Regions:
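Fe(II)/2-oxoglutarate oxygenase catalytic core
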Residues: 1-165, 173-194
Length: 194
């Protein structure tokens, strides 16, 4: 077994969603049905139990109410490829995952961003589900915007195209953020395994 010492080796991108499929999701989540369900993204502060934005009014909006069996299956298949194929040689000491969260939709309008953070997600665990986030799964639904670059490790711009799903460990060693959108609207989703 060969260990991978460059953290970038743990970041994998898969082109798994067709442009038409991505467009169909954007059409659904942009419909009047979901308009009231979008809310400002916040970060949980474990020290005092509060939720707050780190970018003030420039924080993105999120939609948790969207559910799609087809998208769940795409996410599941991509996690499987990452964990059981691309990192199959780690199976002897890494037991994979116990489940994954339903994808949460992200919408970045002009000027909106996501502050630098790592994915220590506390809200996933309500007493029934137990564990820690192990993998972060990001999907990009469009690319007809400017700005909105996905950055890892403080300053590394990750190539990310419409229809791509990117997976990386949900660890403090993988800080990431999205730069402010300059034109258009950026649509993506995120899920986590535990």
């Amino acid at each position: 077994m060969a260990f991978r010492y460059d953290l970038r080796d743990y970041v994998k991108t898969y082109s798994v969603m067709s442009p038409e499929y991505c467009d169909s999701i954007i059409k659904i989540i942009g419909s009047e049905q979901f308009a009231p369900s979008w809310e400002k993204h916040t970060f949980y502060d474990v020290r005092d139990g509060s939720n707050h934005t780190r970018s003030g009014n420039d924080e993105l909006e999120v939609l948790s109410a969207f559910g799609s069996q087809e998208l769940n299956q795409i996410v599941w298949n991509t996690i499987h490829k990452y964990a059981l194929e691309d990192f199959a040689d780690y199976k002897q000491w890494w037991d994979g995952w116990n489940g994954f969260s339903a994808p949460r939709m992200n919408r970045y309008s002009v000027g909106q961003t996501m502050a630098i953070h790592c994915d220590h997600i506390h809200s996933m665990f309500d007493g029934t589900r137990k564990g820690i986030p192990v993998l972060t799964i990001l999907g990009l639904l469009n690319d007809d915007f400017t700005g909105g670059e996905f950055k890892l490790f403080d300053d590394v711009t990750m190539e990310f195209k419409k229809g791509d799903i990117m997976i990386f460990p949900s660890s403090f060693m993988f800080p990431h953020y999205v730069t402010p959108v300059k034109t258009g609207t950026r649509y993506s989703f995120v899920s986590w395994t535990w």
